[in-house]
Design a protein with these regions (language model features):
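Short, conserved loop/helix-junction motifs that constitute active-site signature segments
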Residues: 116-128
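N-terminal beta1-alpha1-beta2 submodule of the flavodoxin-like/Rossmannoid cofactor-binding fold
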Residues: 1-116
Length: 128
């Protein structure tokens, strides 16, 4: 049984919500554990490009946590707990929703597996 997470970046009760819930219903019928989240319902601040997450990882001082203490960790924890993630976003003016862009910015390099692997190698070589 897999854990399936659906992240909806559309308006509440929008077509995006409806489509994701329909997919989740099929997943549940197939015996999978499901979770639906709307990041718009949470307090998630936009990335300010301070690179605190990256510097923390590279220096070995932190695990790459964002300097903001908001609800992003709820989405992050659900994302890492899931075996499959389905993301839905409407397209506004040829771009995804602003909340989805914020999610991508906040999930940036501090969550990139290649970057994290390289940072661990550097820390190991430097004796940290």
């Amino acid at each position: 049984m897999a854990k399936v997470l659906a992240l909806s970046f559309g308006r509440k009760m929008s077509n995006t919500d409806v489509m994701l819930k329909e997919v989740l219903k099929k997943c549940e019928e197939a015996g999978h554990e499901i979770k639906f989240m709307r990041p718009d319902d949470l307090e998630i601040k936009p990335c300010i490009g301070c690179c605190g997450c990256v510097v923390g990882i590279m220096s070995g001082r932190t695990n790459g946590a964002c300097v903001f203490k908001d609800d992003f960790h709820l989405v992050e924890d659900a994302y890492y707990d899931a075996d499959a993630v389905i993301i839905g976003s409407p397209v506004y003016e040829t771009s995804p929703s602003g909340t989805f862009k914020t999610f991508c910015d906040r999930f940036g390099p501090s969550h990139d597996l290649a970057f994290l692997t390289e940072a661990k190698k550097r820390a190991y070589r430097s004796g940290q």
